[in-house]
Amino acid sequence: MGSTSDKASGLANEAVGKAKEGVGKAVGNDRLRAEGAAQEAKGKVQKAVGDAKSAVKDATNKTAAAINKNL
């Protein structure tokens, strides 16, 4: 996945996870609450991966630009 895809998937998983967790708490369903918490955590990790990919890409582009400028 690209950084944008990772970020979007991460945000979606966070949102769905929060919703599941909230519904699970509201209806007293511990399994649904736990699934929601796990999905939210997965989303946070996906988003962090996307952020890291973006940072690496930006650093690579800056390095390439600096090298090309000095050639």
Curated annotation (Swiss-Prot):
InterPro entries: CsbD, YjbJ_sf. Gene3D superfamilies: YjbJ. This is UPF0337 protein mlr2098. Residues 17-34 have a biased composition (Basic and acidic residues). It comes from the Bacteria. Belongs to the UPF0337 (CsbD) family. SUPFAM superfamilies: Hypothetical protein YjbJ. It comes from Mesorhizobium japonicum (strain LMG 29417 / CECT 9101 / MAFF 303099) (Mesorhizobium loti (strain MAFF 303099)). It holds the Pfam family CsbD. Residues 1-42 are annotated as: Disordered.
